[in-house]
């Protein structure tokens, strides 16, 4: 279990992460829809995740969403690197009713995000553009490469949830044990 705390003038965050968990979550960011996405992420990655965030949500949700991504990404990095005896690559296509989102990842230690999901507007009170902000913060702090691409769909909630689940399942698959892999790079280091 990795525990990271981060305090700024905008947020006060505590994250606990066990990547070898069972998908249990205890999420409290004060942002209902975001909590739902993080719970779904934990469940489908099979990570045990605890997140407590006290943020300036009276201003808007941006600082809380981005900062949770930063801290969760840092916890993931500390949990996984250096990568050894793992598949390293993972992918998933997740459908939710009319929506389908694909995610492919590489535990590369080279952060890069391709995000091509067309979600404009709001989901309840949640600004949908914050989904990309979360993924960018997570990916860059986890030091992974992720491509999250919409295959079809138009319902904002479905696209968002399929995106979080696709990342979760791709991560679970990339973390699958492969004792033959050793250091899964021809460079000898990731």
Curated annotation (Swiss-Prot):
It catalyses: D-erythro-1-(imidazol-4-yl)glycerol 3-phosphate = 3-(imidazol-4-yl)-2-oxopropyl phosphate + H2O. GO terms for cellular component: cytoplasm. It is an enzyme of class 4 (lyase). Its main location: cytoplasm. Keywords: Amino-acid biosynthesis, Cytoplasm, Histidine biosynthesis, Lyase. PROSITE patterns: IGP_DEHYDRATASE_1 (PS00954), IGP_DEHYDRATASE_2 (PS00955). It is found in: Cytoplasm. Its EC number is 4.2.1.19. The keyword Lyase applies. One of its GO terms (biological process) is L-histidine biosynthetic process. SUPFAM superfamilies: Ribosomal protein S5 domain 2-like. InterPro entries: IGPD_sf (IPR038494), ImidazoleglycerolP_deHydtase (IPR000807), ImidazoleglycerP_deHydtase_CS (IPR020565), Ribosomal_Su5_D2-typ_SF (IPR020568). The keyword Lyase applies. Pathway: Amino-acid biosynthesis; L-histidine biosynthesis; L-histidine from 5-phospho-alpha-D-ribose 1-diphosphate: step 6/9. GO terms for molecular function: imidazoleglycerol-phosphate dehydratase activity. Transmembrane segments: none annotated. Pfam families: IGPD. Belongs to the imidazoleglycerol-phosphate dehydratase family. This is Imidazoleglycerol-phosphate dehydratase. The gene is hisB.
């Amino acid at each position: 279990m990795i525990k990271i705390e981060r305090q700024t003038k905008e947020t006060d965050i505590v994250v606990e992460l066990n990547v070898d968990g069972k998908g249990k979550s205890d999420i409290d960011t004060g942002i209902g829809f975001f909590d739902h996405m993080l719970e779904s992420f934990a469940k489908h990655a099979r990570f045990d995740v605890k997140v407590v965030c006290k943020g300036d949500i009276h201003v808007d949700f941006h600082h809380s969403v981005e900062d949770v991504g930063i801290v969760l990404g840092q916890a993931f990095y500390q949990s996984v690197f250096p990568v050894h005896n793992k598949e390293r690559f993972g992918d998933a296509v997740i459908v939710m009713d009319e929506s389908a989102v694909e995610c492919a990842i590489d535990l590369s230690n080279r952060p890069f995000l391709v995000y091509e999901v067309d979600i404009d507007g709001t989901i309840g009170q949640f600004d949908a553009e914050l989904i990309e902000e979360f993924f960018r913060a997570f990916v860059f702090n986890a030091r992974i490469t992720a491509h999250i691409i919409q295959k079809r769909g138009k319902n904002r909630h479905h696209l968002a949830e399929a995106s979080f689940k696709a990342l979760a399942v791709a991560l679970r698959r990339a973390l699958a044990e492969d004792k033959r892999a050793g250091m899964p790079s021809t460079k000898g280091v990731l």
